[in-house]
Amino acid sequence: MAKHSKSIPGRGLRVADQIQRDLSEIVAFELKDPRVGMITITEVQVTPDYAHAKVFFTMLSDNKDEIKNTVSGLSAASGYIRGQLGRRLSIHTLPELHFVHDTSTARGIEMSKLIDEANATRAKDAED
């Protein structure tokens, strides 16, 4: 289950989780845009009125041009994606989708490397 802010009510969390699951399937199996490669939907944040949804995704590449192309591909396909979501979800207001590259995984890897380097330096200093 995705992490969410505490200000969203329980139903909003369930809607965001369902949108995340459905978006993952739509992007993986139905979206044909060549700009959108292998991505993972990591989190969906829905506004309380369900008018907007911020969709966070990660991808294997850290290349800024590829990320930009992926965001533009997802944004261009947002009408199609919303249509597919509308067929799957039974909510009155279908949110407008805003796609954002999630950098938390890359930051976590960088932090892990820094910790490993600090531990290696500490071990080396202890040996001396």
UniProtKB/Swiss-Prot annotation:
<keyword id="KW-0690">Ribosome biogenesis</keyword>
<dbReference type="Pfam" id="PF02033">
    <property type="entry name" value="RBFA"/>
</dbReference>
<keyword id="KW-0963">Cytoplasm</keyword>
<comment type="similarity">
    <text>Belongs to the RbfA family.</text>
</comment>
<comment type="subunit">
    <text>Monomer. Binds 30S ribosomal subunits, but not 50S ribosomal subunits or 70S ribosomes.</text>
</comment>
<dbReference type="InterPro" id="IPR015946">
    <property type="entry name" value="KH_dom-like_a/b"/>
</dbReference>
<dbReference type="InterPro" id="IPR023799">
    <property type="entry name" value="RbfA_dom_sf"/>
</dbReference>
<dbReference type="GO" id="GO:0043024">
    <property type="term" value="F:ribosomal small subunit binding"/>
</dbReference>
<protein>
    <recommendedName>
        <fullName>Ribosome-binding factor A</fullName>
    </recommendedName>
</protein>
<dbReference type="GO" id="GO:0030490">
    <property type="term" value="P:maturation of SSU-rRNA"/>
</dbReference>
<dbReference type="GO" id="GO:0005829">
    <property type="term" value="C:cytosol"/>
</dbReference>
<comment type="function">
    <text>One of several proteins that assist in the late maturation steps of the functional core of the 30S ribosomal subunit. Associates with free 30S ribosomal subunits (but not with 30S subunits that are part of 70S ribosomes or polysomes). Required for efficient processing of 16S rRNA. May interact with the 5'-terminal helix region of 16S rRNA.</text>
</comment>
<dbReference type="InterPro" id="IPR000238">
    <property type="entry name" value="RbfA"/>
</dbReference>
